[in-house]
């Protein structure tokens, strides 16, 4: 018997299950036509070629005991590490936001659109973000608005804005609420400087006022938005996200550790030698660098041939700097 993952309870189109230590995804008949459209239109191939979407292989119906005839069963590429948005640094969430907007823009070229916009649909392969929800697409209908607009603003834009202007610890808000930061709360946290950013003014401040005027409702499914208008909306969101960055002069407990520590050059070289010897002796497949700071020893592990290196630090700024150095 295949055990359905409890993480799939919200998706009526399909579910995740595990069999023999492997992860599979079963697509319900209600989504078969959309899935075939994704595959036949060229959207899947385009996203794969651009390294934006997780790859999968399709299991022939009835070919295996766990692949029922009436459903489509996929075996997605397995990731070495699963992380969650409240564990990410600023630039990781920003990368996921920009990727989602890029995918939305591409999907429209193939007559499709994203039906939700949650950071939980993204993971990381190394330092690169990748979209993992193949069932998140729907057919685009001319004149319809972007349904997950508010969801995007609350789950991506609002956390990034508040982290920039207040404190990066607000990125952990996702551990308390899977719905992100409510628009009205995000606006209350904005300093005056935030109102000078046109994108923030439109997509957070104006959006919050409009939502409050409608009694807290999200994007209206009855609103008419032309294709040109939707393309402009996605582009405006992209520019708004791109304009956000962490202040370069912000400091934290460990952000200046390398320059202010008591280690001299000989001490550092000796420590590097010890780490190299340790790794080459044990030949581990995975190394966990706890308190990695700028990732000096994580990089050494990679150079020594370790297949998977996980760098962890509780200091948001040092992790943000490390990730930025890897993706630039």
Describe the residue ranges of each PLM region:
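N-terminal auxiliary segments of SAM/dcSAM-dependent transferases
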Residues: 150-245
């Amino acid at each position: 018997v295949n055990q359905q993952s409890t993480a799939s309870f919200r998706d009526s189109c399909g579910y995740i299950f595990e069999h023999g230590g492997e992860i599979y995804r079963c697509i319900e008949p209600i989504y078969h036509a959309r899935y075939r459209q994704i595959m036949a239109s060229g959207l899947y191939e385009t996203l794969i070629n651009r390294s934006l979407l997780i790859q999968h292989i399709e299991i022939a119906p009835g070919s295996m005991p766990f692949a029922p005839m009436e459903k489509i069963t996929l075996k997605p590429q397995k990731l070495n590490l699963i992380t969650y948005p409240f564990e990410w640094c600023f630039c990781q969430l920003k990368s996921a936001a920009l990727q989602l907007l890029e995918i939305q823009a591409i999907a429209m070229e193939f007559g499709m659109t994203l039906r939700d916009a949650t950071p939980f649909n993204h993971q990381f392969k190394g330092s690169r973000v990748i979209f993992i929800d193949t069932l998140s697409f729907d057919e685009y209908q001319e004149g319809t608005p972007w349904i997950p607009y508010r969801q995007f603003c609350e789950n991506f834009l609002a956390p990034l804005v508040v982290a920039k202007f207040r404190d990066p610890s607000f990125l952990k808000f996702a551990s308390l609420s899977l719905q992100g930061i409510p628009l009205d709360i995000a606006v209350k946290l904005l300093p005056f400087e935030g109102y000078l950013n046109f994108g923030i003014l439109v997509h957070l401040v104006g959006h919050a006022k409009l939502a409050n005027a409608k009694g807290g409702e999200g994007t209206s499914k009855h609103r008419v938005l032309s294709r040109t208008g939707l393309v402009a909306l996605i582009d405006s969101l992209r520019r708004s996200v791109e304009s956000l960055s962490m202040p370069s002069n912000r400091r934290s407990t460990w952000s200046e550790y390398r320059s202010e520590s008591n280690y001299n050059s000989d001490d550092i070289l000796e420590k590097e030698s010890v780490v190299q010897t340790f790794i080459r002796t044990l030949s581990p497949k995975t190394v966990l660098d706890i308190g990695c700071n700028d990732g000096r020893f994580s990089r050494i592990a990679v150079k020594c041939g370790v297949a998977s290196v996980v760098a962890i630090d509780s200091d948001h700024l040092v992790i943000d700097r490390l990730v930025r150095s890897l993706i630039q």
